[in-house]
Regions:
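Active-site-proximal region of nucleotide-activated glycan assembly enzymes
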Residues: 116-180, 188-190
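An aromatic- and histidine-rich active-site surface loop
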Residues: 45-49, 97-118
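Nucleotide-sugar donor-binding and catalytic loop/hinge architecture
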Residues: 1-5, 176-195
Length: 197
């Protein structure tokens, strides 16, 4: 992998999208310290705070999800989607990424759609056993779809699927907490199996 790779990571809305995205960025930086990474998220969503706190630059799109209860409100949603696609096109043109990664959430839709239209390879990362709407819509143009669970060919083209598991932040893997420490901290019985629900 070249050290001067330029990568856009797009998506968010919830921690289920943001933290895997940060894990991907961290893994790329670990292998390619000179990599330039730009996040693209949704304005006024949690990624706009979490991503800069992790040390990465992020640009927000005015995109929002569809309102399934109040259909007339979707006129504004469609307008924001068109504005987001135009803004995503400008971001991509200015940043010139080598690849665009989508982690789900409605912010990844305009970004990856425009990247694909501009001939930039796109990769999707699906964290769930039931694929999200945005990733399903982007699957056809994606070069690769990384999934955490088997059986995802019911949502995605089988030839594009790579079973990778979910990205995990390095700091979680490097913990010094032992099983015995955890049992003591939570006051659990070490002789019993524990299931977290």
């Amino acid at each position: 992998m070249s050290n001067n790779i330029r990568l856009i990571v797009s998506g968010g809305g919830t921690g289920g999208h943001i933290f895997p995205a940060l894990s991907i960025a961290g893994a790329v930086k670990a292998k390619c310290p000179e990599a330039e990474i730009l996040f693209v998220g949704a304005e006024n969503r949690m990624e706009m705070q979490r991503v800069p706190a992790a040390g990465y630059r992020i640009i927000g799109l005015p995109v929002s999800g569809f309102d399934r209860k109040h259909l007339l409100k979707n006129i504004a949603v469609l307008w924001r989607l068109m504005k987001s696609r135009r803004k995503a096109r400008r971001i991509i043109r200015d940043f010139r990424p080598d690849v665009a990664v989508g982690v789900g959430g409605y912010a990844s839709g305009p970004t990856l759609k425009e990247a694909g239209a501009m001939g930039i390879p796109t990769l999707l990362q699906e964290q769930n056993s039931y694929a999200g709407v945005t990733n399903k819509l982007l699957a056809k143009q994606a070069a690769c779809i990384c999934v955490a669970y088997e059986g995802m060919e019911r949502f995605f083209p089988k030839d594009k699927i790579k079973l990778t598991g979910n990205p995990v932040r390095q700091n979680l893997l490097e913990t010094s907490i032992t099983h015995d420490d955890a049992v003591r901290t939570f006051g659990l019985d070490p002789a019993k199996k524990t299931v977290l629900i």
